[in-house]
């Protein structure tokens, strides 16, 4: 479990995160959303130990995340970054996935097994002997995900991992993330269509926590989405248009609207 308590972070004199309090349960998937500058990526960097908070604290399994405890906690946390290119140094896919395992003194037989297991999981097992630099952006992100999964962390953070990908590559990466189980998953994204599939959505605005709630609750409030410049999933836009203009369309039956919302919501989750 991750417990964030009164977390504040300053960059120079500027507060980037302001008194955050939130809890992320084990084996849950949360999406962090908010417009640019809301503090999403800063929070991610603090969680993996790349930055230290100015005030407050983070507890991971009741252990304070600080410089002293970082060697103990770092193996529990993996992160896939926004731009996959800078993570690679001309290795083959096989070598890249094995790289972290070799640095952790894992035996050769186990390395071979894990490389195959996670390459197959992310559908790059036919590319194991290909130089990573020859891959597409989506394939590189799948290699990055396999490399993190092979380390078997308890927490994985995905920081805008589809933002540089074409629509097809983004969809493939999103589908892979949805298959990962028995871990804390944190996806930082602008894509509410994708965030809607997570267990909870955390909304940040100007460094402040606005809400932490199941997606269904968030999307029931069009005014809230409008206030924080969040676009609803495309599959729910019809519901909002009808809700906004229900008197003109002579839809008086609230239960009909609720049924429509439920149908569209289930459609979104199954996509």
Swiss-Prot record:
Xref: SUPFAM superfamilies: P-loop containing nucleoside triphosphate hydrolases
UniProt keyword list: ATP-binding, Cell membrane, Membrane, Nucleotide-binding, Translocase, Transport
UniProt KW Chloroplast keyword: no
Subunit composition and interactions: Forms a stable energy-coupling factor (ECF) transporter complex composed of 2 membrane-embedded substrate-binding proteins (S component), 2 ATP-binding proteins (A component) and 2 transmembrane proteins (T component).
Top-level taxon in the UniProt lineage: Bacteria
Purpose: ATP-binding (A) component of a common energy-coupling factor (ECF) ABC-transporter complex. Unlike classic ABC transporters this ECF transporter provides the energy necessary to transport a number of different substrates.
UniProt-annotated location(s): Cell membrane
One Gene Ontology term of the molecular function aspect: ATPase-coupled transmembrane transporter activity
Enzyme class: translocase
GO cellular component, one term: ATP-binding cassette (ABC) transporter complex
Membrane topology: Peripheral membrane protein
EC assignment: 7.-.-.-
Annotated ranges, domain ABC transporter: 2-231
Family in the record: Belongs to the ABC transporter superfamily. Energy-coupling factor EcfA family.
Name recorded for this polypeptide: Energy-coupling factor transporter ATP-binding protein EcfA
Any single Pfam family the record assigns to this protein: ABC_tran
Residues the entry annotates as binding ATP: 34-41
Main localization of the protein described in the UniProt heading: membrane
């Amino acid at each position: 479990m991750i417990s964030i308590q009164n977390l504040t972070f300053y960059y120079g004199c500027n507060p980037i995160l302001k008194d955050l309090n939130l809890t992320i349960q084990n084996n849950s998937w949360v999406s962090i959303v908010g417009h640019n500058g809301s503090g999403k990526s800063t929070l991610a960097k603090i969680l993996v130990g790349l930055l230290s908070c100015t005030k407050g604290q983070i507890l991971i399994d009741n252990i304070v995340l600080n410089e002293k405890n970082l060697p103990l906690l770092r193996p529990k946390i993996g992160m896939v970054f926004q731009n996959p290119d800078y993570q690679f140094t001309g290795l083959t896919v096989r070598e890249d996935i094995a790289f972290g395992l070799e640095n952790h003194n894992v035996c050769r037989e186990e390395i071979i097994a894990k490389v195959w297991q996670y390459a197959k999981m992310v559908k790059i097992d036919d590319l194991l002997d290909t130089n990573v630099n020859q891959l597409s952006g989506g394939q590189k992100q799948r290699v990055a995900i396999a490399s993190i999964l092979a380390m078997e962390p308890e927490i994985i953070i995905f920081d805008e991992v589809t933002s540089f990908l074409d629509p097809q590559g983004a969809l493939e990466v999103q589908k892979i993330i949805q298959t990962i189980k028995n871990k804390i998953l944190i996806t930082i994204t602008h894509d509410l269509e994708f965030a809607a599939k997570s267990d909870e959505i955390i909304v940040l605005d100007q460094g402040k926590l606005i809400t932490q709630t199941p997606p269904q609750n968030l999307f029931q409030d069009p005014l809230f989405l409008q206030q924080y410049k969040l676009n609803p999933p495309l599959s729910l836009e019809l519901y909002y248009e009808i809700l906004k203009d229900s008197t003109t369309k002579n839809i008086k039956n609230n239960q009909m609207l609720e049924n429509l919302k439920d149908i569209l919501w289930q459609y979104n989750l199954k996509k």
